[in-house]
Amino acid sequence: MPNLGVPELLIIALVIFLLFGATRLPNAARSLGRSMRIFKSEMDEMKTDGDKKELAEKQAPTAEQQQAQDLAQPKSEQPNEHNA
């Protein structure tokens, strides 16, 4: 695959400028920028959702272990008035 140098990139930019015109290029760039921001925010949201799920999965076994420990420990009986 050939390497693109500065002259080739300038020719490509000129062709794009001629195809889309001076009025549509800024709008296209703005639209592309908005799309990139939305994409990045969605990716960050997906990462935080994944972190929350991992944290919940780590905490869930500890809650189950706590319930198992509560069931395994015998409850001490309080002396009643009837037993005295």
Swiss-Prot record:
Amino acid composition bias (Polar residues), ranges on this chain: 62-77
Region (Disordered): 42-84
Residues annotated as transmembrane: 1-21
Membrane topology: Single-pass membrane protein
Any single GO BP term: protein transport by the Tat complex
Keywords: Cell membrane, Membrane, Protein transport, Translocation, Transmembrane, Transmembrane helix, Transport
Family assignment from sequence similarity: Belongs to the TatA/E family.
Protein name (Swiss-Prot/TrEMBL): Sec-independent protein translocase protein TatA
Record lineage: Bacteria, Bacillati, Actinomycetota, Actinomycetes, Mycobacteriales
Gene assigned in the entry: tatA
